[in-house]
A protein has these predicted regions:
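Bacterial N-terminal signal peptides that target proteins for export
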Residues: 2-18
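C-terminal motif of bacterial Sec signal peptides marking the signal peptidase cleavage site
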Residues: 25-28
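Bacterial signal peptide processing site
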Residues: 30-33
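A short, Trp-centered hydrophobic/proline-enriched beta-strand micro-motif
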Residues: 52-74
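Short beta-strand segments that buttress and anchor functional surface loops
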Residues: 66-70, 81, 92-94, 169-172, ...
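An acidic-aromatic
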Residues: 88-138
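Flexible, processing/modification-adjacent segments and terminal tails
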Residues: 117-174
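Gly/Pro-enriched, hydrophobic low-complexity segments
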Residues: 150-214
Length: 214
């Protein structure tokens, strides 16, 4: 499935917030922390990539926090995002511009649940419909848990292209294109700092500010 960020305290067309949200998003990009230079040579990264990819695909727990900007056709919004992975359970918290509104999405083996800014809890088809309504498209949640870490979803075939440093630079998978423009050094090695997920007229940009794992 795919993810959608809250546009306001109540669901309403995202185009009402497009201009202001994108202006805030562009302004906020100026204060993004600089990526740390990689500690391994490109040759070392390429040689170790199969093992590194398998390690990240099997990674059971992590937390990523940062900013999200979405354009879906003529609509768009930006906000804060917090992704918590615990085994097969993904919990995504999204806050709209200036902290207005908040949506909590949980995706696991039992299905999808969504809590609206008003506290209403939805599940199954109702949660899916609300998610698509708020996002403007159906986000690939099952794959995003891997893409955000800079690796392909092991459940689907994909085409990988390395960057100049030997890390994953772009990925074509399940009709989506993932482009990673910057990495940052963390306690778990190099992980994406800036990435874009796109398909058709949908573009999701993520700027990860902090990574954490137990």
């Amino acid at each position: 499935m795919t993810v959608r960020t809250p546009a306001a305290a109540t669901a309403r067309p995202l185009h009402l917030l497009l201009c202001g949200a994108l202006a805030l998003w562009l302004a906020g990009c100026q204060s993004v922390p600089k990526a740390i230079a990689p500690t391994a040579t490109p040759e070392q990264v390429v040689a170790g990539w199969p093992a590194r990819r398998a390690q990240l695909q099997a990674r059971a727990q992590f937390t990523a926090q940062g900013r999200i900007g979405v354009v879906a056709g003529a609509d768009g919004f930006n906000g804060r995002v917090r992704w918590v992975q615990d085994g097969a359970r993904s919990t995504v918290s999204l806050d709209g511009p200036l902290g207005v509104g908040g949506v909590r999405i949980v995706n696991d083996a039992t299905g999808l649940t969504l809590t609206t800014p008003s506290g209403e809890a939805l599940d199954s088809q109702a949660a899916h419909d609300e998610l698509v309504k708020r996002m403007g498209f159906e986000p690939p949640l099952d794959s995003l848990r891997y893409w955000v870490q800079g690796v392909p979803d092991p459940a689907s075939p994909g085409s990988e292209t390395p960057d100049a440093q030997g890390y994953l630079g772009s990925l074509a998978q399940s009709g989506w294109t993932v482009t990673i423009s910057a990495y940052m050094q963390t306690q778990d090695g190099a992980l994406p700092q800036k990435l874009t997920v796109a398909r058709g007229d949908v573009r999701v940009r993520l700027i990860i500010e902090t990574w954490h794992s137990p």
